[in-house]
């Protein structure tokens, strides 16, 4: 049409206006599925559902703020017709004018997220930025009708991409390059965009993938130079890829890179959104040009590949180009060349992308964040769709859809390889090569996103065809590939070309078979096929083929074959392949990017897809995968899709496998890092990947092929034969679970691992598909480690893949179990990833996802199974984190190994209960797993080592074996480990001397065994539901913790989180089995304990490592005292994750209880433990009171567990404990002393690690550390628990012998410090146990002593008497209902008052007791000497580490207090304020000082609170579920305290009280005031001389003192501060802080200006939080509740004035309503009245008055209130004046001017009936006469106003 520019502009303006009218006010895009609200506003259905789902309760219309509900939404079909017609008009306008519709992005965003928009818009987007980019892309999209055609397919594939788009303009770019990179989601798209936009420079940029991401665009030449060097690394192959990349780049320049080359705008667009990915892509492109020029051979290869790939590539490209009219011509012209180049390029790009991704992991993560959030909805939609269509897609893809899909995949793979060659070509190719299915999945997933954008119809269309299955496979494979690529990068540098050629040929040969087999058998054939396929084709197939190696490898190969056959006539195929290629490349590149990047953004999109599971996984992958920045995002989506496919069939199984694969990959990454630990930290590896990004990428790709090629041969050649068998079996089951994903993972992992094996060792093949596989993985890692840094990378990839495969295999073996396991693994991965990436975001998402997954996977079988697997995964996760820090690498390998072993064993475990015990101990788990089926294979490798010994020994040997494998790793990694700060560092340290023993025990066992133990305990201790919830919470909190303490605490946190996950899931299934196991064999207890000791020892060793590495050896050597180890490890587990922490004690408790046949306590403890972990995590993460209550309940249970544990220890390990202690602390002469040292060391080691974590958390989240603190609490709690458990063990020993008990108590001070948090829990559980203890006084005393040792630290928290009463009442309460979580509700106000009175009596008794104890304590000093010696024995360690440990413990206590405060907050206002105060103080105080001071303060507060009913209430609820439990207990305690039972109960009660740290601190406060050593000495002596209870109390006090003092010795300043704090706390007892005061003395409130309804709410609030509500304000009143407006402005009332004058909290009624809403007493600071209607709306008078009580505004004034006053009695006015510091005079004649005071007469003139009255007064007394307003204004503002204004005339 010949339209004048003006006319066109007019039409465009009209269309723009129409579009604006038809766009959704929320997303500002054209309304997709219009829904109308009651208020007649139109929104997108998706936007409204998102809005409605965000809030609980009614949501508001964004436009008119009217309430809207889901029911009120009505679909508006007519409006949707309008939108459709508008889009048609716009499209026609674009076609007619050839102009992009400026605002077409609005509809394109949703509908036209097609590549054409991306392509056309790419250059614009490049220059304009992501948002503009997206718009321009969309604008350009409509211009190309063909593009829109592809757009539908693209949109289908873009559905996954759409998330990216929403997240960032990633989707837009993806859409632009959708044709080429449909497979890549947001992150890959971003990469592609980046690389494409820099396509002009991309040749040069490509050269600098490592650190030149940012520089890429700036220095093309430089980058080219760098790229050349990189290319030199992978010369031949890299050049091949380079040529391909160049040609592809040119093609993409036309197609996808409008920015770089207008034709390539799409790819460019893809690359751009990723920022870093952009650079990486650009680097790739540059590299490809350089490579092109450099390597003609590569071009030849590429041509050869083109012959196989060209048809698909050309077809897909041609179809894309045909579809995208504008780009079509450019593309078609270079079609042949480009095809060839693309074929070469994909390989090149794949490698390049790999390099590039490592190069740009940082920015992709950054960019991921936004896309992640924006993509959330899209991903969710896609996930749902996947869930619905997964099974269909899976079967479709595997069967009929297989050939077509595979062809498409091949096309998609090849084309995307070419396109992605720029942005994610490396990644995509790698992903494709490793995951052909993944490519298809990606394609489909992407298609889904596009469809989502376009509409549900499009959604359905594309999805059916290829997104779901390929995406899932692709995701899994991407993960595998990500790790895998790293590995092949190294291994295949030289063989890459040859292998690529071989693979190319093999692919064509094997394509059909693979295609057909793709589900189960494809892996084996795929590997050879890939090998046989051309080098370039193989490289291409590294995308498609490796992807096919899963399920789609065959498809891809067939596709390639078909493409080869139909090079010219393949246009129809081309279209298919183009479509697939578009989707696949995107998915591949995205997957690769996700894999490699593991960045938040990539996490985010996939997280959405995977519901956060991928998010966490990706962070794990991030460590290894940081090279592929874009990939992780897409990988997440595809993985999610992949898992969704399988998951659709197996609900969580699929997602779990995906997660597992991610986790596995992370593990693999870590293993890789371990393998590459040759002084190459993960960072170094990343750098090398960045610098050698292309060569390594090539290597990675080649190994992908190579692995595929050698996978089968190596399988046969190596012990991998066994693994091959496993592989086959697992393949089948895996395919069943996630046909493509599993196959992809397995095949890929196998192939890669085999290639690695062939290159490195045959161990890798073993790790592919079985327990052996997992072991092999570890083994492979070892050789790889021995090899060069590149080999470690390969090893990492292999390990990752192996882990994935293992997981998949495990899934298959126990499909139900597998699902749970996968879920757990996914959780672990997700949570680790989250830690690595945006932990808050991810953790939140992960929590939801975990909840969903765990809800879905409640089968005990796979729970059990997943438990072992999860520990592995946990280890893997931890190690993945370590992976980034090479220093953690040693642990990683061990953990990975064990993880894999555990996974393999996990399968067995599902079969055998014995496996549960195995789960308890990783080595055992490995052994047991092998025992069932993999035993033969395992025995070949590890079983021989592990199986040789009994289960106990098996644990040890297994650990040793794993260690042996990892030993080679460890030595190399020891230096690297040091960078890992606390957790890894410690491992490293012990690694030198105890590397063989300890690394296995401590790293592997600590992480793996611990997780397993934790999970086993979790099963026992936690209910399934609780566990799943807890898992979510735990992973969240852990994730948060991990994020803040990424380096130091990340591994620990990750371990804890994954352990928690494991525990949670296994807990469900495992509870029965675990119980059976625990009951089954306390042989297993030994194993169990052994595993615990290993873990525990590991931690103590870690602690000692810095101090002595001999200790860890001793610990390991002293496996016989497994109990101590066990106890230590259990705390370690707890430390790792609060869930683990609580679970570990529960486990012990369960064991002991089983021994004691105390199922009540056991189950209760279990539940509570689960609740605790759950709540701790939740509370930590969310700061929710309920979770905290659960936490405390769990804590209480843990206490019980600890106690039971001690009892068990008494029964089974009294002698062993000393041995263990001696072994640990050989230097210490007394066994108790050594045990103390051991405990302390362990605690300290944990503390150190935890401290790092806590400190990092503190620094990052000091006051918002509700979550972090909780995490700290959980960590610290774990530490404390470890200490407590060890103490418990020791105390058990003490139970056996009082001497030991005394010594234990003596020891406990160390432990006590760490235990405080733990002991709180312990004392609670011990309260539960106390019922048992009460059974016999002797036993009670012993247990009390044990508990003393464990809980005397707690006694620090509570006075002895209080502790006793607490214990007694708590015990009775536990008997009545340990789970009396609602007891506070049950108790009436009268009862509470009675309890409070009892508390007061108790306080007095406690004070007396304290005095007696102090006297006794000062007398005996020999015990203190021994105690001091003991303390000092470990103190040398402690001195170095106790400071950290104290800090960590204090921090933990602080955080625990904080959590407690939160929980108590909800439970009781009294409790909350103190807790809040202490937590606030803790947070405020830096380092140990803060934590210790806060801890002491808290301890004191708690003690005081304990004494004062409210204190106990607060603490009990926090410690125990119900405050009322504490109240009732206190009542009972008060009664019992009167009795002498107090003495016998004192230890236990003290322990129980200790959790509060009340009596302990109170006593402790006094004792610290006195000479610490003297007090300490006195107390120990007293322990002997006094009754057990009294001595226990004294001991606990002493211990608190001692622990404080030992740290004081180590860190005098800190201890001094703590002591000073404690002293000041004890001195300040009455007025600790307003909040403390509130807790200490019951809160008292008055309300002013409220309606009767509101008053009822206040009454309800007061009842809930044990607050006294009165009608009149009194001296005791603490809070004045004012009716205010939303700005906290109130009317002035008498209570308002009196509240301000009295310095009370004058808070808004909103404080009550919000506190009720959130279920806890909120901080008043946020609700304090700011002003009033008279004196100003923000004068801050109440705050000023409250904060300056010492500065009285009327000080020095004599005021006479004369005459009548209205609205208030004169005496009230006089009281007000008195409160403000004035002296009141009744008559003006009574003024005393000589006193230096200033007289003032206050009158109210309008109240006088006679005029003359008040005028004479001033003359009579010569004092100024002012109106009452002067007083009121001065009080309201709390500033003495000038009298002149108020003088009476």
Swiss-Prot record:
It is found in: Nucleus; Chromosome; Cytoplasm. Pathway: Protein modification; protein ubiquitination. GO terms for cellular component: BRCA1-A complex; BRCA1-BARD1 complex; chromosome; cytoplasm; nucleus. It holds the Pfam family BRCT_assoc. Keywords: Acetylation, Activator, Cell cycle, Chromosome, Cytoplasm, DNA damage, DNA recombination, DNA repair, DNA-binding, Fatty acid biosynthesis, Fatty acid metabolism, Isopeptide bond, Lipid biosynthesis, Lipid metabolism, Metal-binding, Nucleus, Phosphoprotein, Repeat, Transcription, Transcription regulation, Transferase, Tumor suppressor, Ubl conjugation, Ubl conjugation pathway, Zinc, Zinc-finger. Residues 1642-1729, 1749-1848 form the BRCT domain. Residues 530-558, 620-662, 882-912, 1036-1070, 1172-1211, 1321-1389, 1412-1433, 1452-1493, 1562-1590, 1621-1640 are annotated as: Disordered. Residues 1336-1360 have a biased composition (Acidic residues). This is Breast cancer type 1 susceptibility protein homolog. It comes from Bos taurus.
